Amino acid sequence: PEPVPSRPTGSTPTVRPASGAGPQRVLLVDDSRSIRTLLKIYLMARSFEFLEAESAEEGLKVAEAEPVDLILTDFHMDGMNGADFAGQIRASANPKLSKVPILMMTGDPNVAEVRALGQKAGISAFVRKPVSCAQLMTLVDTILPLPRAAK
């Protein structure tokens, strides 16, 4: 099937339950449009539907309003960082949102410190940028298996 294009930031999406019928939904949270575009290209093989946010604060609003199956977030962003964002997702009163897998990425040279902050916040996986397509797909396949067909 053709990948579903992401909705432009600020547009009104059609709401559908995460993990229900249709493509799995991924929220991409990164202040770099080019990184968000690259991630979509890498993940096209899974036919995800993409939601995007340019900041952690915007990502929280989107995640609270829209059901998602996976969150990919950068660590370094203006305002709230990716670890604090992940911590707020984990603390959500919405039980489905609080359990959504979170993959945090960073280009920070202090990988051990950033990874520790992410793990303390409850991330599901961590990857250092630049990330290859194969590496990203392996991580995504590990934390978000393909949905099983109904029996």
Located regions from the model:
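Alpha4 helix (beta4-alpha4-beta5 surface) of REC/receiver domains from two-component response regulators
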Residues: D84, P109-V127, T138
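Helix N-cap/capping motif at the beta->alpha junctions
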Residues: E52-K61, G82-D84
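Charged docking surfaces used in two-component/phosphorelay signaling
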Residues: T37-A45
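Hydrophobic/aromatic residues positioned on beta-strands within the core alpha/beta folds
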Residues: M105-T106
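Receiver (REC) domain active-site loop signature in two-component systems and cognate sites
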Residues: M77
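Active-site beta3 strand of CheY-like receiver
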Residues: E66-L72
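The C-terminal output helix
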Residues: D141-K151
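C-terminal output helix
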Residues: V131-V140
